C-alpha cells in the first residue's frame, strides 16, 4: 500500500487518507460507489474508473458498488439543492446500464448493488441497528450537512440519512467481502470517515478511507459540463467526436489535472507532458484527447473522432464529401430528422429545436455576430428559413457554431 500512496502523492492526486493506511499489505479489497442517477456514466465517473484500475495495478482487489438503493435517496455531497427523486423503475433501469458499463470498462471486477441488502432492511431495523451508532452532533458537524442546514434550501431527513446508508454499505462489504478500504472524491471524505467509525463501533475491525481531488476548473466548477449539458461516456449520448473536441477546447491550464486523473499514463510521461505544455499546449491536448477517447471508446471510437475532426476542420476550400457526411451521421455527430418536419422553418427555431443552441436568444446573438454557419457560410438573417437549395447532396446540412461546435442534419 505504501507504493500506491507514494505514487498518488507524486502524481498529485491524493487528497486525504486514513492514518495507518500505508502500513496495509496486499492482498486487500477496496470499493468505490456509483449512484445510478442517470442512464449513463459521465466523464466525472471516469476518474473513479481509472482509480479502480490503478488500485488493481498495485495488487488491490477493486470492487464497484452500484447504488441501486442510495440512488433513490440522492447524495447531498456537493449539492446546494436537493436532487429530484427518481422513480423505482428508472433507478432499476439505470442500475442495469451502469453495471453493464462498469463491467465493460473493468473486466472481471466484482460489481455489487446495495439494493440487494438495503432493499430488504426495515425502517425499525435500520433505526435500531444502524441509527443508534450515530450521534447528531458529529453528523451536523460534517461539512456537507453543515453547509446545507444553514442554507436557504436546508436539508431533508431523506438526504440527511444518506450518510448512514453509505456507512452501512461499507460495513456490509467489510463483513461480507473483506473490503477494508473505501475510495472516492474529496467530497466523500465525511461519508467515508462516518463509515469507518460505524465499523469500529460495531466491533467489526479497522477500516480505512482514501480520497482523490475532484476535477474542477480554476473557478471551482466541476469539469465535465458544457453549455449543451453533461459529457457522457455512452457514445449514444456524447459521440466520440464530441468527447474528443471537449478536451481540445479545455483551457491550457486545466489539461494538467485532466491527464493526472483521467488517464493511466505513468508519472514520468505526465511530467514530460507538463514541460511540453508551455511550448506546445495544443499538441499535448490533442494527445490527451486521443488517449482518453481510445480508453473510453476503443480504437474504433478514436478513429471515428479523428475522421470527424478531419472532415469538419478540413483545409479551407476543401469540400466535404457525401461519404464523409454519411460517416459523421453514423458516428453520432449528427441528427436524423424527417424532411417535412424542418423544411420551411426558420433556422432560428431549428437550431433550438435540435439542441444546437440553448435558446433563441443565444441563436440571435450568434447570427448577429456571424457565428452561426450553414454549410460553412455565416447565417446573416434571423428570419432565414431552411429550403431545398441548402441541402448538400439533396439530404444534408452542416451546422457550425463558431470554429468548434458542429452538427450534421440528415433530412432522410
UniProtKB/Swiss-Prot annotation:
Keyword Protein biosynthesis: yes
GO cellular component: cytosol
Domain S4 RNA-binding: 345-411
Binding site for ATP: 225
Gene3D superfamilies: HUPs (3.40.50.620), RNA-binding S4 domain (3.10.290.10), Tyrosyl-Transfer RNA Synthetase (1.10.240.10)
Taxonomic superkingdom: Bacteria
A single MF term (Gene Ontology): ATP binding
TM helices/strands, residue ranges: none
Record's catalysed reaction(s): tRNA(Tyr) + L-tyrosine + ATP = L-tyrosyl-tRNA(Tyr) + AMP + diphosphate + H(+)
Pfam family, one: tRNA-synt_1b
Motif ('HIGH' region): 36-45
EC number of the protein: 6.1.1.1
UniProt subunit comment: Homodimer.
Protein family membership: Belongs to the class-I aminoacyl-tRNA synthetase family. TyrS type 1 subfamily.
UniProt-recorded name of the protein: Tyrosine--tRNA ligase
Record lineage: Bacteria, Pseudomonadati, Chlamydiota, Chlamydiia, Chlamydiales
Gene label: tyrS
Amino acid at each position: 500500500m505504501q507504493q500506491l500512496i507514494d505514487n498518488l502523492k507524486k502524481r498529485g492526486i491524493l487528497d486525504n487518507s486514513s492514518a495507518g493506511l500505508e502500513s496495509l499489505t496486499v492482498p486487500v479489497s477496496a470499493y468505490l460507489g456509483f449512484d445510478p442517477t442517470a442512464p449513463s456514466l459521465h466523464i466525472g465517473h471516469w476518474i473513479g474508473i481509472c482509480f479502480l484500475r490503478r488500485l488493481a495495478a498495485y495488487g488491490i482487489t477493486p470492487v464497484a458498488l452500484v447504488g441501486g438503493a442510495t440512488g433513490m435517496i440522492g447524495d447531498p455531497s456537493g449539492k446546494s439543492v436537493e436532487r429530484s427523486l427518481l422513480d423505482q423503475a428508472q433507478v432499476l433501469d439505470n442500475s442495469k446500464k451502469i453495471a453493464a458499463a462498469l463491467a465493460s470498462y473493468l473486466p472481471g471486477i466484482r460489481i455489487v448493488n446495495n439494493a440487494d441488502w438495503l432493499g430488504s432492511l426495515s425502517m425499525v431495523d435500520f433505526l435500531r441497528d444502524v441509527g443508534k451508532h450515530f450521534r447528531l452532533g458529529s453528523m451536523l458537524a460534517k461539512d456537507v450537512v453543515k453547509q446545507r442546514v444553514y442554507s436557504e434550501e436546508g436539508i431533508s431527513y431523506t438526504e440527511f440519512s444518506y450518510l448512514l446508508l453509505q456507512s452501512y454499505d461499507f460495513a456490509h462489504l467489510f463483513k461480507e467481502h473483506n473490503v477494508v478500504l473505501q475510495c472516492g472524491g474529496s467530497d466523500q471524505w465525511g461519508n467515508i470517515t462516518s463509515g469507518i467509525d460505524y465499523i469500529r463501533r460495531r466491533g467489526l475491525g479497522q477500516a480505512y478511507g482514501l480520497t482523490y481531488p475532484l476535477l474542477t476548473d480554476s473557478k471551482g466548477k466541476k469539469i465535465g459540463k458544457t453549455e449543451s449539458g453533461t459529457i457522457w461516456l455512452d457514445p449514444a449520448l456524447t459521440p466520440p467526436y464530441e468527447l474528443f473536441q471537449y478536451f481540445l477546447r479545455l483551457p491550457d491550464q486545466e489539461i494538467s489535472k485532466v491527464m493526472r486523473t483521467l488517464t493511466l499514463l505513468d508519472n514520468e510521461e505526465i511530467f514530460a507532458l507538463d514541460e511540453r505544455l508551455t511550448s506546445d499546449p495544443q499538441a499535448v491536448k490533442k494527445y490527451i484527447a486521443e488517449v482518453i477517447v481510445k480508453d473510453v471508446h476503443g480504437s474504433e471510437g478514436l478513429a471515428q473522432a479523428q475522421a470527424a475532426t478531419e472532415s469538419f476542420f478540413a483545409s479551407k476550400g476543401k469540400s466535404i464529401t457525401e461519404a464523409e457526411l454519411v460517416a459523421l451521421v453514423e458516428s453520432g455527430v449528427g441528427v436524423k430528422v424527417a424532411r417535412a418536419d424542418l423544411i420551411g422553418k426558420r433556422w432560428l427555431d431549428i437550431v433550438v429545436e435540435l439542441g444546437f443552441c440553448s435558446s433563441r436568444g443565444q441563436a440571435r446573438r450568434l447570427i448577429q455576430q456571424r457565428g452561426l454557419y450553414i454549410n460553412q457560410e455565416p447565417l446573416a438573417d434571423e428570419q432565414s428559413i431552411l429550403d431545398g437549395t441548402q441541402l448538400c447532396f439533396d439530404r444534408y446540412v452542416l451546422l457550425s457554431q463558431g470554429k468548434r461546435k458542429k452538427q450534421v442534419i440528415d433530412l432522410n
